[in-house]
Amino acid sequence: VPRIAYLGPEGTFTEVALLQMVGRDMVPGVRPAPADGKAGFTPVLTDSTPGALAAVRDGRADHACVPIENSIEGSVLPTLDSLAVGEPLQIYAELVLDVAFTIVTRPGHTGPVRTVAAFPVALAQVRRWLAAHLPDATVVPATSNAAAAHEVAEGRADAGVSTQLAAQRCGLDVLAADVVDEANARTRFVLVGTPGAPPPATGADRTSVVLRLDNAPGALVSAMTEFSVRDIDLTRIESRPTRTELGTYMFFLDCIGHINDDPVAEALKALHRRCTDVRYLGSWPTGSSAGAPPPRLDEATRWLAGLRDGTGGS
């Protein structure tokens, strides 16, 4: 049975995303849940996102499901940093989850809410709601959205910012549902494993790499040019410190397309020649187009092919 690592305890948004991935047949070796509802995988619960990726690296898990980007807070930096260093890992699938929080309390609680347990990322997305509805409550940090529910269930907080799944698992009452300060809050989760053949190209794919560049004038522009001259749509460019020397950075790039698309393949080869290091994070389906797909065989390519095979290059 495949082992899948994710941030615990049970009931986190990551688990919700993973269950949706399983339901859509996106996890290798795991079929959608049968009628008895039993999951076709063994959960490996960890106390952090880097911990979930470490479980894949050290063989305790076959895959990890981790958040990588949030529409409110931006990139999930612990995920990026963990993917960029250590033994290589590869992304095989992604799922975008609409995020809204459930405010939970213990059954029968009727007194004032003096303390609210909240995961810091969740707190940033419900501050206005808490200020309007629970202005006198003190926030108690929790290690995850599901952990906030456990804090409430075990009597260490009067209320918690959590998930509907965690409320059900812990037997808690719902004080408020679908709570979020910004409408359309969404988080993108990815399924990560050890390096292997990528999923087949679908026409709606994403490719991600991490670049390390020499500290030279125009180095970053030159790398970007490899995409622009091939009409490849870059959807994310982000820098992170290397943590090895002050002022040195690595660059995360996402583009539309698959490594088996000729323009993307040519761009990756050019980056390999040009950059100090290129870490390939994978090519995987996005389900729907996230931008302009790379161009197909163009007139210039047909012209060159004609010269090569002797059929003429006119």
What are these regions (language model features)?
Residues V1-S314:
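Domain-level signature for soluble enzymes in the chorismate/prephenate branch of the shikimate pathway
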